Amino acid sequence: PNGLLNGQSYYLARNTETIPLTDDLFDSDSHCMVNLKTAHVSVVEKDTGRSVICNVEGYPYVLIWSAAKKPLHFICIEPWHSLPGEENGPLEWEQRPCAASLKKGESWSTTLSTT
């Protein structure tokens, strides 16, 4: 709920390249995908083939979400390098699972490509 981790794992899809976008897909909130075996996540309009392609290569987590409103009007694809907070977890960033932080003087960069 509220975009936070709740400790439960499930399969949104297995051994497939397609997740149908239905009006109830986000009834339980966003979906955090891990261990994707693809470099790209796409939203494709099935009637026209028009698409938005997001390069997620190098990102260990990809969240997909939409407004909790029906019918489904949009979908957001968010490649992440860390995880959202836990439902009953610590509020401090440094205590969160997979939290990325830099020491003084360190730098880090990444690239996100969407077509």
Where do the language-model regions lie?
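Short proline/glycine-enriched turn/loop segments at secondary-structure junctions
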Residues: 65-67, 98-103
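Active-site/ligand-binding surface loops and adjacent short beta/alpha elements
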Residues: 1-57
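Hydrophobic residues positioned within well-ordered beta-strands of beta-sheet architectures
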Residues: 39-41, 75, 108-110
